Amino acid sequence: MSVVTMKELLEAGAHFGHQVKRWNPKMKKYIFAERNGIHIIDLQKTVKGIEEAYEFLKTVSAEGGSILFVGTKKQAQDAIQEEAKRAGVFYVNHRWLGGMLTNFATVRKSVEKWQRIEQMKEDGTLYLHTKKEIAKYEKERQKLELNLIGIKDMMEIPKAIFIVDIKKEKIAVEEAIKLGIPIAAIVDTNCDPDLVDYVIPGNDDAIRAIKLITSKMADAILEGKEIFMKKLEEEAEKAAIKEKILQEEEYQKSMDEYIEE
């Protein structure tokens, strides 16, 4: 059974590209036709792209790898947050701070700073400061929370990244490429597909299209996690059996020694 159907993509408006004059010629092989000055994306290629990205993210997840969802444009913010939370992965849906990947240690320090302010708020020490200082701390806390809440528990560089609109998320793309992190992304007709490892040709402006494709990526991760958990259970079971055998051998050995005495 296919991960997604042409009908679903059509209903979500995933086939609408940008104006012809804004196209990137490298997207030519993903374009089906031109209608009223708008490029129409070949949805057969979209289905194939989704299936390939699905398998990739499922594999990463099945191996226990962490994944990051990125989409800061207004149309993508809700889908990115909702689907990342559903799949239990990290996300950035407000602002990509330069160095989020390439200067990860500094980002971790920002997370720690935010958590310190949160702690001050909880234990009441924040309110020992002047009103002006409290207002300053609160403003900083809100800003840090908005930008970092989706990655606060991310302790290392992710093994894969899923992006909505690689043109908008240019810095995220550059950082991932620099670090050799594979990218799966929705790539519209005005973008360069060569920057992406797993190209999903599609409309990166339509809320329904973004939601549909992002939900499929989340499904892939959840499927991979099931495989990973099953693997862990099997390994734990094997370890328990091995431990039991060793205990029995030790017991038998001690009994043999007792009999000999």
Curated annotation (Swiss-Prot):
GO cellular component: cytosolic small ribosomal subunit
Keyword list, A-Z: Ribonucleoprotein, Ribosomal protein
CDD domains, sorted: RPS2
Molecular function in Gene Ontology: structural constituent of ribosome
GO biological process terms on file: translation
InterPro entries listed in its UniProt record: Ribosomal_uS2 (IPR001865), Ribosomal_uS2_bac/mit/plastid (IPR005706), Ribosomal_uS2_CS (IPR018130), Ribosomal_uS2_flav_dom_sf (IPR023591)
Pfam families, sorted: Ribosomal_S2 (PF00318)
Taxonomy, superkingdom: Bacteria
Coiled coil start-end: none
Gene3D superfamilies: Glucose-6-phosphate isomerase like protein, domain 1, Helix hairpin bin
Family, as annotated: Belongs to the universal ribosomal protein uS2 family.
Matching PANTHER family: 30S RIBOSOMAL PROTEIN S2 PROKARYOTIC AND ORGANELLAR, SMALL RIBOSOMAL SUBUNIT PROTEIN US2M
Protein name: Small ribosomal subunit protein uS2
Source organism (scientific name): Thermodesulfovibrio yellowstonii (strain ATCC 51303 / DSM 11347 / YP87)
